Amino acid sequence: MNTRDKIITHALNISCEIYNANKNNIISNNNRSSSTIKAKRMFIYYLYEYMEIKHTGMKKYIKDINHASSIHHVNKFHFELQTYEDVKKYFNTFLTEMKKFNVYGGGFYEKRKEIKKLLNELNKIKND
């Protein structure tokens, strides 16, 4: 298992812990209970927004999910994150746990943020 897969597996485990959901129900995509949907929604949002996995790539992690369902979950979670305090609190807990898991040693999120900043600067210079 490579580092990226370890991070993704940990993200799935943390989202399941937060919502008390069964990991296999999320992966197999065959359960519509509230806790499963909430955990799956958070997991998909994280994969899309933080791991930069495209909607069409979600099927690698969740069986038989199509890109439209992935888009729906990301948009719905984004709305809930902006609207509901409890979702915001749970997601902050999730992010804190993910940062603790830091398998890159020097801070994956910080490095990613720095790379994006440098890419933006390069694009700005290129366009000027």
Regions found by a protein language model. Give the residues of each.
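N-terminal leader segment of winged-helix/HTH proteins
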Residues: 1-14
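Short, low-complexity, charged amphipathic interaction modules
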Residues: 107-128
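Short, Lys/Arg-enriched anionic-surface-contact patches
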Residues: 14-40, 65
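Short, amphipathic alpha-helical "recognition" segments used to contact nucleic acids or chromatin
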Residues: 37-53
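Short, basic interhelical loop/turn and adjoining N-cap
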Residues: 54-73
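Residue-level preference for well-ordered alpha-helical positions
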Residues: 16, 48, 59-60
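DNA major-groove recognition helix of helix-turn-helix
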Residues: 48, 73-81
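Short Lys/Arg-enriched helix C-cap and helix-to-coil transition segments
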Residues: 81-107
